[in-house]
A protein has these predicted regions:
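Generic structural signal for well-ordered alpha-helical scaffold segments
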Residues: 66-73, 159, 163-171
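Active-site-adjacent alpha-helix immediately C-terminal to a catalytic or transition-state-stabilizing loop
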Residues: 91, 102-104, 163-223
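Phosphate-handling substructures
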Residues: 100-163, 216, 226
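Short, solvent-exposed aromatic-acidic interface loops
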Residues: 225-233
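Short beta-strand scaffold positions
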Residues: 84-85, 160, 181-182
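Active-site-proximal alpha-helix that buttresses catalytic centers in soluble enzyme cores
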Residues: 3-21, 25-105
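Short, glycine/charged-enriched secondary-structure capping and boundary segments
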Residues: 48-51, 96-99, 122-125, 193-197
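Short, active-site-adjacent cap segments at secondary-structure transitions
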Residues: 42, 89-91, 115-116, 186-188
Length: 233
């Protein structure tokens, strides 16, 4: 996890300078993405490869992790544009953050930030899933970056989709803060795009539930500000 400054104006004498981020706060007027992985899903869903299935959040976790929602509500810029994916777990997570003190905001559904589509393999148990693979799985992901399930996507496909989405949003919302409640695979794909690394390399990043990853786009050049920051911890 990498620590990062919060968003807002820098006090006099504490400005970021040159190419460095060394002030307590991030400067305004930067095209900045605040990527949040959705909260923990319910127990039955965690027993299978749910991919893009629309599974609900864990109700007990919603209560137990209330301090994390409050920390995110305080951490995020107050004037950000909000985006979720078509799956209810991202909408529910966004709602919980807003209810925890951020305040109600309109959200825009962005399909380009969906999780990896596992096609015919979705819904398989964790024990059954490896039997379907044609390639060795990634050490930190159920399948390699090149593995493409029947009717689904490879992580290489996800990286291309997410990269295109980020470029489009950066062009549509220049110099604005954007909160994107998304998924672990999609956030790894965003890092792959920002760092120009392979899908397999990006899968080495840990992206935990409710973690925050911040990316910036400066005239088409991407910077990673923080990865897998856990709110309130």
């Amino acid at each position: 996890m990498m620590a990062a400054a919060s968003s807002g104006p820098c006090p006099e004498g504490q400005q970021n300078h040159g190419n460095f981020l060394d002030a307590p706060r991030l400067e305004r007027g930067v095209t900045r993405f605040w990527l949040i992985r959705h909260a923990l899903v319910e127990e039955n869903a965690r027993a299978m490869m749910y991919g893009t299935m629309d599974v609900p959040l864990c109700p007990d976790s919603l209560v137990a992790q209330q301090p994390m929602y409050e920390a995110l509500a305080h951490r995020l810029p107050s004037d950000a544009c909000w985006f979720i994916t078509p799956l209810s777990r991202t909408r529910s997570t966004a709602q919980a953050i807003q209810n925890a003190g951020y305040g109600s905001r309109d959200v825009t559904v962005e399909p380009g930030m969906l999780e990896q589509e596992l096609g015919e393999w979705q819904g398989l148990s964790h024990g059954e899933f490896p039997k379907r693979l044609e390639r060795a799985p990634h050490y930190f992901w159920p399948l390699s970056g090149e593995e493409k399930p029947p009717g689904g996507e490879s992580m290489i496909d996800v990286c291309a989709r997410v990269g295109s989405t980020l470029e489009r949003l950066a062009g549509a919302y220049p110099k604005q803060d954007m909160v994107l409640v998304s998924h672990g695979g999609a956030i790894r794909a965003a890092l792959a795009h920002a760092l120009k690394i392979s899908a397999d390399t990006a899968l080495h990043f840990s992206i935990q539930n409710l973690s925050l990853t911040i990316l910036e786009c400066h005239d088409g050049i991407w910077r990673v500000v923080t990865v897998n920051e856990l709110p309130g911890i």
